[in-house]
Structure formats: structure tokens, C-alpha cells
Amino acid sequence: MSQSGKNGLTYSDAGVDIDAGNLMVEKIKPHVRSTRRPGADGEIGGFGGLFDLKAAGFSDPVLVAANDGVGTKLKIAIDADKHDTVGIDLVAMCVNDLVVQGAEPLFFLDYFATGKLDPDQGAAIVAGIAAGCREAGCALIGGETAEMPGMYSGGDYDLAGFAVGAAERGQLLPAGDIAEGDVILGLASSGVHSNGYSLVRKIVSLSGLAWDAPAPFGEGTLADLLMTPTRIYVKPLLKAIRETGAIKALAHITGGGFPENIPRVLPKHLAAEIDLGAIKPPAVFSWLAKTGGVAANEMLRTFNCGVGMIAVVPASEAEKVAAVLAGEGETVFTLGRMVARAEGAPGTIYKGNLAI
């Protein structure tokens, strides 16, 4: 029998506070309940989350799964003690990857790991996750909170998200009929989103600015503006897909920018010709480029530069698709067109100059 009593060790002595974990669960329950949707109406706390595909209205679905994190944007959240929006980023990075395949996000699970659990901090993070789930229309059906002393220093923590969606068989994207002359629509980003933050933090360090300093590129503090949540494009895109039937492909512009993300959804014989002059980058990108001396090509392969999502549509349907998206609050513009690609040529071609 193990030693017990006042001289015996407890789990708390090792740095794990079960009571703090239980307190956090109670704090997050209302946030989790707020994400309920057809197919998911259970409570958290079981060994697994449940989802009923039939109740969600699917007849012959194909499931689509994605997982992602927030990257070193979390270091800004930690250093600035601002934790209420990183959960939105976490959801956005996953569900935007689902919708580009034509899938409706159904449910989400999170993983939150920290060296020492702060129930209030954890609840703020999960509140953000729930907000992202509501915006995407998916249910938060479970998650894991891991308190791991010795694994993380100070107040550091990490997040991972897992999302599952579905599309009816035969309705997945990209479609097989992308053709030369198709139009590329750009959907504006809300800012840096959740990629390139190691470079962002390096540039901020070179600038000498503190996180609570007024941002040189907008209203608010540097931390507030750099922590602007990643835009969630799910509901507008699903509406455009279903109402127009004209979207042939979508690409989520994340790490690697245009050259790493657009070719992933294109056939080998086509390239995306991008008109850089059509982009109106948010002021943060000009500040990053000038303060860090970052060349335009490096900006384009690191950041979204103002375009968080692209859609490939027939030229004859571009105006209709853009109108549906604009009606749902998106800023949409003609970004380029599909052109022939020679064997071995890059999948993205630029014309014009980026206004940074």
C-alpha cells in the first residue's frame, strides 16, 4: 500500500490540481452548451462526444476532418495576457480547411495543455473556442485539458483543434472542371490571421515597441491589433456553394501564402495568375514589411497579405457568386484568373505590384 497521511505526497504536490480542473469544467459548461446544433445536444464530461449525422440532415455523407493550432500567435496572447480570442483562431484554422473541400463543419474538439492550470484563463480560452464554433455552426462536443508541470515554462500553454465536417457524396471540392479563363475571387482577411507570427514577433522585437504601445498602423494597442481573430468564412461560403452551384475550388490562404496554398487545389496543367494590384492589404502588412525590411516575395510566401480565402468560379458566374458573398458581409474582389501552365512551371504567376 502506498504511503498516505500528512507525510505522503499528493498529485497536487506534483503540480497537478484536480480541483482546478473541475472548476474550469464548471466554468466552461455554459459556453459549450451555446454551441449545440442538430446532431449534437449532449453534455460534456463523457468519455467521448457524440454526433448524429442523420439528425444533421445528411443522407449519404462523406466525412472530412482537419486539425490545426494557433502557432506562436499564442506567445503574444501569453505576453500580453489576452486570451479571449485565440480560441476563435483555433476554430477558424480548422473549419476554414473543411469548407474549402465543400464540407459543412459539424463538430469540434480542443486540446489545451499548460504547465499550471488557471481556471479563469482556461475558461476565457474555451469561451473563444465556443464563439468560433457558433460562428462556424459546429458543436463543441469535447476536449482535453492537460496540466503538465515541467513541460511548459511560466504561463505558457498550447492549443490544438480538431474539426469534422461532412458533404454529400459527389459534392466535394475541388471540382474536376476547373478551366482556363475561370475567375479567381479574393475574400479579404481580417489581418494577419494565424500564420507568420514568428516573423511578426521578430519584427516587433526589432521595433522596440511594447505590446501595450499604441499600434503604428491603426487604432488600439499593438497586441490588440495583432491579436485580431482569424476570419471564419464558413457560412458565407456554404451559402454561395449551395445557392449558386458555381464554386469550383476554394483555397484557404495560410502559411506559405498564395504559392503554397492555391496550387493545392488546381490541376497540374493550370496556374493562378494573380493581379497583385487588386489587393488592398491592411495597414499591418505595410508596417511589417517596412519595419522588418521584408521583400514583397517574402511577404507573399509568409502572410495572407490581405486575402484569407480564394474561390475559383466560371467567368460567367463571378458576379453572382461575389454578390452572394458580399451579401453575407464578405469583402470580395476579382483577384485573377486561371491560365495554362507549362510542365514544371509554378502554380502561381504574379502581375502588378503589391501595395505595401
Swiss-Prot record:
It comes from Rhizobium meliloti (strain 1021) (Ensifer meliloti). It is found in: Cytoplasm. The keyword Iron-sulfur does not apply. It catalyses: 2-formamido-N(1)-(5-O-phospho-beta-D-ribosyl)acetamidine + ATP = 5-amino-1-(5-phospho-beta-D-ribosyl)imidazole + ADP + phosphate + H(+). CDD domains: PurM (cd02196). The keyword Ligase applies. One of its GO terms (cellular component) is cytosol. PANTHER family: TRIFUNCTIONAL PURINE BIOSYNTHETIC PROTEIN ADENOSINE-3 (PTHR10520:SF12), TRIFUNCTIONAL PURINE BIOSYNTHETIC PROTEIN ADENOSINE-3-RELATED (PTHR10520). This is Phosphoribosylformylglycinamidine cyclo-ligase. Its main location: cytoplasm. Its EC number is 6.3.3.1. Keywords: ATP-binding, Cytoplasm, Ligase, Nucleotide-binding, Purine biosynthesis. GO terms for molecular function: ATP binding; phosphoribosylamine-glycine ligase activity; phosphoribosylformylglycinamidine cyclo-ligase activity.
